[in-house]
From Swiss-Prot:
May be involved in the transport of coenzyme A in the mitochondrial matrix. Very little is known about the physiological function of this carrier. This is Solute carrier family 25 member 16. It is found in: Mitochondrion inner membrane. Solcar repeats lie at residues 32-118, 126-214, 236-326. It holds the Pfam family Mito_carr. Mostly in thyroid, liver, lung, kidney and to a lesser extent in heart and skeletal muscle. Keywords: Membrane, Mitochondrion, Mitochondrion inner membrane, Repeat, Transmembrane, Transmembrane helix, Transport. GO terms for biological process: mitochondrial coenzyme A transmembrane transport. InterPro entries: GDC-like, Mit_carrier, Mitochondrial_sb/sol_carrier, Mt_carrier_dom_sf. PROSITE patterns: SOLCAR. GO terms for molecular function: coenzyme A transmembrane transporter activity. It comes from Bos taurus (Bovine).
Amino acid sequence: MAAAAAALAATEPPPAMPQAAGAGGPAARRDFYWLRSFLAGGIAGCCAKTTVAPLDRVKVLLQAHNHHYRHLGVFSTLRAVPKKEGYLGLYKGNGAMMIRIFPYGAIQFMAFEHYKTLITTKLGVSGHVHRLMAGSMAGMTAVICTYPLDMVRVRLAFQVKGEHTYTGIIHAFKTIYAKEGGFLGFYRGLMPTILGMAPYAGVSFFTFGTLKSVGLSYAPTLLGRPSSDNPNVLVLKTHINLLCGGVAGAIAQTISYPFDVTRRRMQLGAVLPEFEKCLTMRETMKYVYGHHGIRKGLYRGLSLNYIRCVPSQAVAFTTYELMKQFFHLN
């Protein structure tokens, strides 16, 4: 993380020169640039995850084969959860999700912009490749910084009404720390998460950025419009942003999904009866493949992930593009 922080610091815009009140220009745009970029990414992440929170809960239940819902499909589970736990059951774990997703989204989008600049200026890598590299690095940075919050969120989402191991976020933190190896207990499943996040974030940012670049290059009038904060910059129209974000999410999710399944099982740890057979990433993937195969194991719940990932990424990229204009980041 120190290396990541140093890399980000290397591309921080220089301090703005004092200007008269109300003055615009490049210097004014650099005022609190990091804070504005951080807020834009955080808001984008929260909007995206709130949109698909019920689907996230169902995904966790299906991936880990919760015994109450193991024989049900995606839509059957969506109907069964409210009957058993009430409609708020679809949002179980969402409080922890919001606490995690704001810094996650903020760090990821902010890091992407800075890594992209760093890779281009310091390494001389340009074209579309720098988006792939910057996206992968940004995703890994965000994961490492916020992983303990995701661990707690998954534990809370896996609980079923009447069978609570944890009473809330703070209790979950205390219990995991006390019973699962202290601080390291919060990082179970980190390796498959990083291995899954690198291609996911990389492909996601690469696909969206490439579609945006190609679209604005070949059909600027049809697909684009001037940015509200900087008329000299073309941005995609909102509905085109949504489409490009959805396509990017679908492609990225297909590539990285087996790592996501592995991560969830490792995060749940002692909550699962087969805990001792899933201590490492290799053991977990071997267990899931051996007992459930590819379609019902490593790719179980993928249909749900398409349903949740496409709108989630569409909303995330679109909201971020709008926030960039609102916070004068273009």
